[in-house]
Amino acid sequence: MKFKHKSVLLHETIDNLNPKDGGLYVDATFGGGGHARYLLSKLNKGTVIGFDQDEYAISMAKESFAKELQVGAEPRLMLVHDNFCHLKENLVELGISDGIDGIYYDLGVSSPQFDQPERGFSYRFDARLDMRMDQSQELDAYTIVNTWSQKELSDVLYKYGDEKFSRQIARKIVDRRKEKPIVTTFDLVDVIKDAIPAYARRSGGHPAKKSFQAIRVAVNDELGVLQESLEEAIKLLKPGGRISVITFQSHEDKIVKKIFKKYSEVEIPRGMPMVPADSKPTLRLISRKPIMASSDELEENNRSHSAKLRVAEKL
């Protein structure tokens, strides 16, 4: 089975990295490798290090990028099976200690992960509740749904899914699991449908969409690891190096925007005649507003509708 995933904002993400021959670049979310392949095509010399916590994605990449993975005087591509929040320690293990020239993120779940029923990400297929991007971790969706308290469930659904019926759904989950465990995705869909009023189910897409998103974010601590990784990535960038981040959820975009703002602005104390050397900004924003998909891409790739790209450069 091929890892078929159409990359979003492909040219915008890589072109804004301003890649240079001989550079060292990190693909923090390798997936199907679409962005990496385009980046490698722009480099006569240079290396891309691809991170992915999904073992399936790594195994597929080893097949489709066999030529680029060949060990030579200067490898074109190196793969790391780990979460992108462990950037520094993995780079050190690879003997890289003098920084990187660029890094990019394509956040969220890839199409193949959604389309594999056994992964339990989608409400479209009946499968055991799972939703783990890293199959080796213990916490899964089944554990959250069947063991977390009603308040914890309600908070997750509201905070990560913007689900306005979070309390009703959490209450219904707790009531239902008292009768028997909620084992599969369809079990959970049935509970959610029962909890949401009929008038609300008739509009706004699938009634389980927001809840499934919220539980997935909680399972993988997506917002926590994103913040941790961005902070680390900015430190690892060499002066002139750039960071590109594609988000699909408002929660993700808020984190990226906040961190970019934190490192690109300086608060000057009142009365101070000049900016102290240690108070100068770390980043320069390449675009004040997020870059969105073109009209052509919106027609070709439905996934691009909610995509936002933010880019910054290390000073």
Curated annotation (Swiss-Prot):
Primary location group: cytoplasm
GO cellular component terms listed in the entry, alphabetical order: cytoplasm
Cleaved signal peptide residues: none
Binding-site residues for S-adenosyl-L-methionine, renumbered to this chain: 33-35, 52, 84, 106, 113
Keyword hit for Signal: no
Catalytic EC class: transferase
GO molecular function: rRNA (cytosine-N4-)-methyltransferase activity
Catalytic activity: cytidine(1402) in 16S rRNA + S-adenosyl-L-methionine = N(4)-methylcytidine(1402) in 16S rRNA + S-adenosyl-L-homocysteine + H(+)
Disordered: annotated span: 294-315
Keywords: Cytoplasm, Methyltransferase, rRNA processing, S-adenosyl-L-methionine, Transferase
InterPro entries given in the database record: RsmH, SAM-dep_MeTrfase_MraW_recog, SAM-dependent_MTases_sf
Subcellular location: Cytoplasm
Tree of life domain: Bacteria
EC number in record: 2.1.1.199
Protein's GO biological process: rRNA base methylation
UniProt xrefs under NCBIfam families: 16S rRNA (cytosine(1402)-N(4))-methyltransferase RsmH
Family: Belongs to the methyltransferase superfamily. RsmH family.
Role: Specifically methylates the N4 position of cytidine in position 1402 (C1402) of 16S rRNA.
UniProt-listed HAMAP family: 16SrRNA_methyltr_H
Name of the protein in its database record: Ribosomal RNA small subunit methyltransferase H
Gene name for this UniProt entry: rsmH
